[in-house]
């Protein structure tokens, strides 16, 4: 069973931001979600309220997110989470027949 410092479920803006923050702090990350990121971001015609990216299209924002996580060498694991078990000081994460700890 693989052990991680942190498991993040979801590849929307909040999940990616959490993954970047954890990576900068040299944590071993399990980022679970779609490698295509959030469809909601890409569908946005124009995003007006994202700091540093004024009036950006959702498609351009998605590309900026993808470029940033690639530069930081963050891997997205495309597995469905079935169950999360509290295990005292860590959590067990079941993904099909696989388990991980974080």
Identify the residue ranges that each predicted region occupies:
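Beta1/beta-strand and adjacent pyrophosphate-binding region of the FAD-binding site
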Residues: 1-14
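Core beta-strand elements of the Rossmann-like FAD/NAD(P) dinucleotide-binding domain
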Residues: 2-4, 95-102
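Glycine-rich FAD pyrophosphate-binding loop
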Residues: 7-9, 24-43
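Gly/Ser/Thr-rich beta-alpha loop segments that engage phosphate groups in nucleotides
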Residues: 12-17, 60
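Flexible, glycine-rich phosphate/dinucleotide-binding loops
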Residues: 15, 38, 56
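Short Gly/charged-rich anion-binding patches and loops
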Residues: 17, 36, 64
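Gly/Ala-rich phosphate-binding loop of Rossmann-like dinucleotide-binding domains
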Residues: 19, 23
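N-terminal Rossmann-like dinucleotide/flavin-binding domain of flavoprotein oxidoreductases
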Residues: 42-99
């Amino acid at each position: 069973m693989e052990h991680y410092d942190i498991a993040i479920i979801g590849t929307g803006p909040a999940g990616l931001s959490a993954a970047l923050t954890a990576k900068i702090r040299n944590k071993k990350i399990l980022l679970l979600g779609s490698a295509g990121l959030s469809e909601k971001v890409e569908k946005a015609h124009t995003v007006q309220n994202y700091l540093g990216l004024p009036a950006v299209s959702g498609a351009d924002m998605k590309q900026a997110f993808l470029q940033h996580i690639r530069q930081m060498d963050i891997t997205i694991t495309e597995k469905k989470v079935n169950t999360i078990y509290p295990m005292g000081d860590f959590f067990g994460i079941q993904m099909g027949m696989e388990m991980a700890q974080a």
